[in-house]
């Protein structure tokens, strides 16, 4: 026989006709069986987790309990003693088959009370189904807000009792009122308006109008709004508290405990992690406003970045002029002779075409680095490296002019192989090659192309002076 799989109540979805059909079905067939030996007790305990699982399994008066109509099973028990416990109300997917089976059992047990018991069963069935729909789908029947929610307790979790939309309305209205008028007076006059607010907006579909704040609220006190968002950036990440400063919200909390409609809502403000999806949907317009306010600094930063990039493009056009300026700037810093500079420039020109189409990337690097004293585009790590190279490489350059001898062909080939390997691995993008290829070309214009071989020699000097750059990378 089909035993019950103890499915939780929230898995079953309500289909109204099936439960009434099943209860009528029981009423019709209850007259076929003799119920004289043992009658059901009217106040029989209901089983919560096993919906429709009645206590007649081991008893002699089970009867044809829950005949499945669609499959056409007619199983008349022996003298009404065999319990064939099919899931009577489940064949239509009824969510509240528990109540229909239960009341049909009562009506079979007490035959003279057949009709009133079934009617009460249907009423209870409707009420429970309505409550279930309203708690889980408040947008389907907004008139549910008129009924009081009896089984609401703060101790239970959100799974047992989903958040009730009625208790949500005063909370959101507190937020709306607090934004407009008296928030600077630490919130005390505002709470006095609470009991009158649900009367205006608490019933019918107008609750959703109350949940959405008016667009006129932020412009009335713009300075207050901005200061509160700044204050919230430091401390709070809760969406409910985001329109208030923390201090003002605590004042609300302390005074709101005097009013019965607002106690649940104020306490639930701190339980924003367990709020239902409906709650989050209702808060979206307010949150989008706040995020717009909060991303002001970010948008300003992005605008500045775009401006810098546009400037860089302009400097790209005037690249020749800027390089000349850099050359004249570097003439003061370097004491090397014109001959060495010419030789190194020749090597530079030989080396750039050998980079296999990297010339465009390198030119961008040169431009960005050449504008370094003017614009703060480089990151902090590159700045630090720039400073370090200034301290190490550039000062040594004037002293160690004899090390600036032209590179041999072996060194050139070695450098090219290493740079190609690194290019293939894509390490340039990750910034690992900071003291390698990028730096060689980055500081080329400053030194009028004399710095490149010196960095090569410096790198080889630091790595035991005979080995290649493989040790550094």
UniProtKB/Swiss-Prot annotation:
Annotated keywords: Activator, Cytoplasm, DNA-binding, Methylation, Nucleus, Phosphoprotein, Transcription, Transcription regulation
Record's compositionally biased regions (Polar residues): 194-204, 251-286
Keyword DNA-binding: yes
Localization annotation: Nucleus; Cytoplasm
A family per Pfam: Vasculin
Keyword Kinase: no
Tissue specificity remark: Widely expressed. Some isoforms may be specifically expressed in veins and arteries (at protein level). Isoform 4 is widely expressed. Isoform 1, isoform 2 and isoform 3 may be specifically expressed in vascular smooth muscle cells.
One Gene Ontology biological process: positive regulation of transcription by RNA polymerase II
GO cellular component, one term: cytosol
Region: Disordered, residue numbers: 1-25, 46-149, 191-342, 444-473
Function: Functions as a GC-rich promoter-specific transactivating transcription factor.
Record-stated family: Belongs to the vasculin family.
Complex formation: Interacts with GTF2B, GTF2F2, RNA polymerase II and TBP.
Protein name, per record: Vasculin
Name of the gene: GPBP1
